[in-house]
């Protein structure tokens, strides 16, 4: 069940990354002007704080566990998604189909989530797939140093940490969880590459 715990963390992280980062970037790019400037300044401040420091402090203050790790990642790992979403919005906000929706009286949020979002779903999905290995590695690192998921729950990081204590006597036991975690992260990266080639017309033409 150790890979299931790590993969489950990646799935939950994927949903919150799309919800927070994507919405933030789309709104910032669509409204522009002072709204975009203020939102981007906040984004720069949030991105300037080391993410691992925030996650570690939250785990020291709150009770360690899956919910705390998800909450910590939710506060720190949405910046990349928001930048991708904003860049795509800036490309499409002045396109004819958006201008036509405005002319017909469509509201801002209808245009953002019903008109623009379906047209940028490719880059969004690709970014999500690339972000999941980061979440898995962060959880594994925190569990390895004793700040992750507590007993009786178990993840790949906590399993590696436990086997590391007996590395001098049974070094071969630590190899399987390391290989599993590496393959899990590699599979998401390969999936992201495949989705990018399948969903990006520019990649198809190369």
Predicted regions mapped to residue ranges:
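Single conserved hydrophobic/aromatic residue that forms the stacking wall/gate
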Residues: 1-13
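Transmembrane alpha-helices
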Residues: 14-20, 109-141, 188
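A short glycine-centered flexible hinge/capping loop motif at secondary-structure junctions
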Residues: 17, 21, 25, 29-33, ...
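Generic hydrophobic transmembrane alpha-helix motif, especially the helices
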Residues: 19-92, 125
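Amphipathic cytosolic juxtamembrane alpha-helices at the membrane-cytosol interface
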Residues: 32-40, 90-94, 98-126
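Short amphipathic alpha-helical coupling elements at transmembrane boundaries
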Residues: 37-44, 58, 87, 99, ...
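C-terminal transmembrane helix and the adjacent membrane-cytosol boundary/short C-terminal tail
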Residues: 59-62, 66, 72-76, 122-132, ...
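Glycine-rich helix-loop "coupling/hinge" segments at transmembrane-helix boundaries
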Residues: 59-61, 88-89, 137-180, 206
